[in-house]
């Protein structure tokens, strides 16, 4: 049976925490380009509201997101399951880990600063979740994904 509802992916709604990134054009010229922070409409008011909370308030706990929205957490989780095709907890963790990956690759923020920015209870909690889900430690990820001259390429 054909799917009636198109699933919304994290790639469609993710917002980078960076302020600007350097872009190199085909002619070799470069500029620092603003990174947009506007919510890209997903077609769902629920999803757009959740993404706004995730990005601007950095809240990643289902109960806290539901409280901010003034809705029942179970109903919100059910709606998110329908919209994304995955449990809300998985969606929140993937979104949050995307932020962590970008902070590790593009900034010199310490792991404890990143943990605080991404609503982890501690640096060790972030390290544990990151290593389990991504398959390497945050330090190893940073070493293999961050440009040596990252400050030239990114502003945060």
Describe the predicted segments one by one.
Residues 1-55, 62-63, 67-74, 83, ...:
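Alpha-helical bundle regulatory/interaction domains
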């Amino acid at each position: 049976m054909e799917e009636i509802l198109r699933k919304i992916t994290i790639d469609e709604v993710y917002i980078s925490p960076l302020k600007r990134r350097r872009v190199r054009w085909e002619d070799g010229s470069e500029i620092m380009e603003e990174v947009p922070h506007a919510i890209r409409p997903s077609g769902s008011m629920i999803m757009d509201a959740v993404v706004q909370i995730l990005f601007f308030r950095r809240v990643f706990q289902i109960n806290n997101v539901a409280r901010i929205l003034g809705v029942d957490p179970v109903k919100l989780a059910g709606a998110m399951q329908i919209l994304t095709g995955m449990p809300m907890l998985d969606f929140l963790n993937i979104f949050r880990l995307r932020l962590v990956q970008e902070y590790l690759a593009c900034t010199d923020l310490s792991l404890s600063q990143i943990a605080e920015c991404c609503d982890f209870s501690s640096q060790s909690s972030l390290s544990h979740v990151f290593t389990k889900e991504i398959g390497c430690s945050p330090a190893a990820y940073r070493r293999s994904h961050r440009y040596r001259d990252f400050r030239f390429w990114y502003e945060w």
